[in-house]
């Protein structure tokens, strides 16, 4: 199995933008990368405002939104609760089997969870249980401001306690006027967790284009460090890029 599992310290911290942007950059580099978000609540997969649509747009993958996200619910709740209220049951094996099916099309997959690692996910699993099934290195997306050191260090400790590898942290939504504090938070996270902060992604105000996001990712995220993980797993694109 190859790729990354993108998780976060909380919801609405920029996880989807980070996942889509990194996938898009890797595809530009020639890697046969796909994106996968098994469960989505808050929007159905086809909604252009939803995460699946944003992942498709930023990454440039050929798969459709309902293939990127096979299980989606309109109600904005934790996925397990949203599915339960809608009378639907999704099990861990289903989303893991779907992942394995996507690997027939892509050499690597960037998988986005929902919220943080302890979120109730499928009927029988938390997000972290899914991450453990895949055994992909984690990218933790976090806020850059007050409270992020505690949340990020706890997330990393929880992941490590469950035997997961954390590739790095990306602080998302960094504003120029706050950069001194952001830099201090970055250094503290690295010191306390032993995990590198691989990027300080700027805050995107209003509407933004794919090109703007990908260029920002190239400038502000250490793509080469992430590339080492893919190469070490012998997953440089051997199939044609799509």
Swiss-Prot record:
So where does this one cross the membrane? none
GO BP annotations of the record are: biotin biosynthetic process
Give EC number(s), comma-separated: 6.3.3.3
Q: Which cofactors are required for activity? A: Mg(2+)
Task: Give the enzyme's main class according to its UniProt record, as a single word.
Answer: ligase
An example Gene Ontology cellular component term from the record?
cytosol
Q: Which InterPro entries match?
A: DTB_synth_BioD, P-loop_NTPase
Q: Where does Mg(2+) bind?
A: 16, 51, 112
Q: Name one Pfam family in it.
A: AAA_26
Localization per Swiss-Prot or TrEMBL: Cytoplasm
Q: Provide this UniProt record's keywords sorted from A to Z.
A: ATP-binding, Biotin biosynthesis, Cytoplasm, Ligase, Magnesium, Metal-binding, Nucleotide-binding
Q: What are the protein's GO molecular function terms? A: ATP binding; dethiobiotin synthase activity; magnesium ion binding
Question: Which amino acids does the record list as binding ATP?
Answer: 12-17, 51, 112-115
Catalysed reactions listed for this entry: (7R,8S)-7,8-diammoniononanoate + CO2 + ATP = (4R,5S)-dethiobiotin + ADP + phosphate + 3 H(+)
Which pathway does the record list? Cofactor biosynthesis; biotin biosynthesis; biotin from 7,8-diaminononanoate: step 1/2
Can you tell me which residues form the catalytic site? 37
Ligand binding (substrate): 41
Organism superkingdom = Bacteria
**The family this protein is said to belong to:** Belongs to the dethiobiotin synthetase family.
Q: What PANTHER family does the entry give?
A: ATP-DEPENDENT DETHIOBIOTIN SYNTHETASE BIOD 2 (PTHR43210:SF2), DETHIOBIOTIN SYNTHETASE (PTHR43210)
Quaternary structure and interacting proteins, as annotated: Homodimer.
Q: What does this protein do?
A: Catalyzes a mechanistically unusual reaction, the ATP-dependent insertion of CO2 between the N7 and N8 nitrogen atoms of 7,8-diaminopelargonic acid (DAPA, also called 7,8-diammoniononanoate) to form a ureido ring.
Q: What is this protein called?
A: ATP-dependent dethiobiotin synthetase BioD
Tell me the organism's taxonomic lineage. Answer: Bacteria, Bacillati, Bacillota, Bacilli, Bacillales
């Amino acid at each position: 199995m190859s790729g990354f599992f993108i998780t976060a310290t909380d919801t609405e911290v920029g996880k989807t933008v980070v996942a889509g942007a990194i996938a898009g950059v890797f595809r530009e580099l020639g890697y046969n990368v796909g994106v996968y978000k098994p469960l989505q609540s808050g929007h159905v997969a086809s909604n252009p405002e939803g995460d699946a649509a944003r992942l498709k747009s930023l990454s440039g993958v050929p798969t459709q939104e309902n293939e990127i996200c096979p299980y989606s619910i309109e109600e904005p709740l934790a996925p397990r609760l949203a599915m339960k209220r809608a009378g639907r049951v999704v099990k861990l094996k289903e989303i893991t089997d779907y992942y394995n099916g996507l690997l027939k099309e892509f050499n690597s997959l960037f998988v986005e969870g929902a919220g943080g690692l302890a979120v109730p996910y499928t009927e029988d699993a938390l997000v972290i249980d899914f991450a453990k099934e895949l055994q992909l290195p984690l990218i933790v997306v976090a806020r850059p401001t007050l409270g992020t050191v505690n949340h990020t260090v706890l997330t990393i400790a929880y992941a490590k306690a469950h035997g997961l590898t954390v590739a790095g942290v990306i602080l998302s939504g960094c504003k120029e006027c706050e950069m001194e504090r952001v830099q201090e938070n970055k250094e503290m996270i690295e010191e306390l967790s032993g995990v590198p902060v691989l990027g300080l992604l700027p805050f995107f105000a209003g509407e933004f284009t794919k090109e703007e996001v990908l260029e920002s990712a190239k400038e502000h995220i250490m793509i080469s460090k992430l590339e080492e993980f893919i190469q070490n797993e012998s997953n440089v694109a051997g199939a044609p890029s799509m």
